[in-house]
């Protein structure tokens, strides 16, 4: 999954400078033990609006998966009390929003479909559904594809329309080049099982690998797109929301995932995840840590110190945010490309290269990147880097993040993008036409540049001061109201 290019600049801003002065952030609930209310996509997340670095007093619950209320309009204040009637109505609504077919029904239909002769295998493009002969009359006026081959059934991502709603799914799929590289790399590293979280095309590639070509690998796909339910048996697919660790088919699906991770005492498994770029890093990190904990439950005591190998595929400008939650992660130079995105494709140069990278806790010197694509090994950094990523003797590192050659700034004491120049007014490097209003990064509470607002040690004092100001204004307002009532009995 990926985000569209028109969101790239705003995403880069979010990733590179941390949280903005204004926006919406995930918040901690006042009562951590209380379950969050549920929307059709599972447990909701608690959010808080932030304006100029200050949190608004009331927090609210909203959908974890949908960033646009047109897709999921759930909204509830944290302190809001709902009647039994409203809770019952919400439960009915959540049930109505679920797919028309249960997981068991999808499996039954799939087993029937693959037994049909080729001439009777039809797919409704209008409804995005495999059709049995009994369904033909109902879909007679729809756009149909006939003679669905076994190969097509094995590649549902090419049969289904991508869900390109950029605020909900942003479903952009790996290009064959990147997909084949990833599958080959996983096999070279010796993995036997791959947990694909939001990576349907990699899941397909692994399952399509011909026996004998390389060591056999198995894959389990976790994805929120219910349409994949009709193409896989229960041991190959679980409908899953990666933003809240919600298995839509309950305990049975959770046990499938658990067994997959804990097989062979957790050895030989890796998690590969490709979240929507517009998703918040914090809830993703929380979810991935729950999957890691699930994996650790199956380990022997001798292996309790080990980490679950992970490939997290995300834009390079989220590096600091990802490493904040997973300090052992490093970013590889490999540029991941997407098949159905005009700008995230191989062969582009300069600023328009794909910004998508692989973050991993596997030592980078073990990961060989393809030399035919221009990657080379830096003996000093002990990792493969892109062609233009030159080693800086001052930083003692290959510093480029975006595939271009970066320049060292002796004032900032670090390498910066080639389009940036040093501004003496701001005392930092920036674009030539920037506004000299000072850096946007740093803490909006105390002004320090070494942490963000959410980690500020003064946040408690700041909140107390804000509360005191609000109370003072409220007392003044009440006093004016009382005086007005006296004057107008």
Swiss-Prot record:
Lineage: Eukaryota, Metazoa, Chordata, Craniata, Vertebrata
InterPro entries, per the entry: DNA_methylase_N6_adenine_CS, Mlase_EEF1AKMT1/ZCCHC4, ZCCHC4, Znf_GRF
Binding site for Zn(2+) 3: 378, 381, 391, 398
Name of the encoding gene: Zcchc4
Comp. bias (Basic residues): 470-479
Region listing for Disordered, in residue ranges: 467-489
Family statement: Belongs to the ZCCHC4 family.
PROSITE patterns linked to this entry: DHHC (PS50216), N6_MTASE (PS00092), ZF_GRF (PS51999)
The organism of origin for this protein: Rattus norvegicus
Predominant location: cytoplasm
Residues noted as binding Zn(2+) 1 in the record, renumbered to the chain: 39, 41, 63, 72
Domain remarks: The regulatory loop blocks the catalytic center by bridging the methyltransferase domain and the C-terminal CCHC-type zinc finger, resulting in an autoinhibitory conformation.
Binding-site positions, Zn(2+) 5: 409, 412, 422, 429
UniProt keyword Zinc-finger present: yes
Protein name according to UniProt: rRNA N(6)-adenosine-methyltransferase ZCCHC4
Zinc finger regions, GRF-type: 39-81
Catalysed conversion reaction: adenosine(4220) in 28S rRNA + S-adenosyl-L-methionine = N(6)-methyladenosine(4220) in 28S rRNA + S-adenosyl-L-homocysteine + H(+)
EC number of this enzyme: 2.1.1.-
């Amino acid at each position: 999954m990926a985000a569209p290019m028109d969101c790239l600049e705003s995403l880069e801003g979010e990733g590179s400078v941390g949280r903005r002065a204004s926006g919406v952030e995930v918040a901690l609930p006042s009562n951590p033990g209380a379950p969050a209310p549920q929307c059709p996509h599972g447990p909701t997340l608690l959010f808080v609006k932030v304006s100029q670095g200050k949190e608004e007093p009331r927090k609210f619950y909203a959908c974890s998966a949908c960033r646009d209320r047109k897709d999921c309009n759930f909204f509830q204040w944290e302190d809001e009390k709902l009647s039994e009637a409203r809770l019952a109505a919400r439960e009915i609504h959540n049930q109505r929003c679920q797919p028309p077919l249960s997981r068991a029904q999808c499996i039954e239909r799939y087993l029937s479909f693959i037994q049909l002769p080729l001439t009777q295998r039809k797919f409704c493009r209008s409804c995005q559904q495999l059709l049995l002969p009994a369904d033909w009359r109902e879909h007679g006026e729809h756009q149909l594809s006939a003679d669905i081959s076994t190969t097509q059934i094995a590649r549902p991502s090419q049969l289904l329309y991508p869900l390109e709603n950029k605020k909900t799914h942003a479903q952009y799929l790996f290009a064959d080049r990147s997909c084949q590289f990833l599958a080959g790399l996983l096999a070279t590293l010796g993995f036997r099982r791959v947990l694909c979280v939001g990576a349907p095309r990699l899941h397909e590639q692994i399952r399509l690998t011909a026996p004998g070509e390389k060591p056999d690998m198995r894959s389990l796909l976790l994805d929120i797109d219910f349409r994949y339910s009709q193409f896989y048996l229960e041991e190959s697919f679980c409908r899953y929301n990666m933003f809240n660790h919600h298995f839509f088919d309950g305990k049975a699906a959770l046990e499938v995932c658990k067994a997959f991770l804990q097989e062979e005492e957790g050895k030989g498994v890796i998690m590969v995840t490709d979240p929507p770029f517009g998703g918040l890093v914090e809830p993703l990190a929380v979810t991935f840590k729950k999957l890691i904990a699930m994996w650790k439950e199956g380990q022997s005591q001798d292996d309790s110190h080990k980490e679950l190998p992970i490939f997290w595929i995300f834009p390079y400008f989220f590096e600091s945010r990802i490493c904040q939650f997973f300090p052992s992660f490093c970013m590889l130079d490999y540029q991941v490309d997407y098949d159905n995105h005009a700008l995230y494709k191989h062969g582009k140069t300069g600023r328009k290269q794909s910004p998508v990278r692989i973050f991993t806790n596997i030592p980078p010197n073990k990961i060989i990147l393809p030399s035919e694509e221009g990657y080379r090994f830096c003996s000093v950094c002990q990792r493969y880097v892109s062609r233009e990523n030159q080693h800086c003797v001052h930083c003692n590192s290959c510093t480029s993040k975006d595939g271009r050659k970066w320049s060292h700034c002796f004032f900032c004491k670090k390498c910066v993008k080639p389009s940036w120049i040093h501004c003496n007014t701001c005392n930092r490097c920036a674009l030539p036409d920037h506004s000299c209003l000072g850096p946007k990064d740093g803490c909006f509470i105390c002004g320090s540049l070494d942490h963000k607002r959410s980690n500020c040690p003064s946040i408690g004092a700041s909140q107390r001061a804000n509360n005191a100001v609000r109370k003072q204004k409220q007392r003044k307002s009440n006093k004016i109201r009382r005086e007005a009532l006296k004057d107008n009995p």
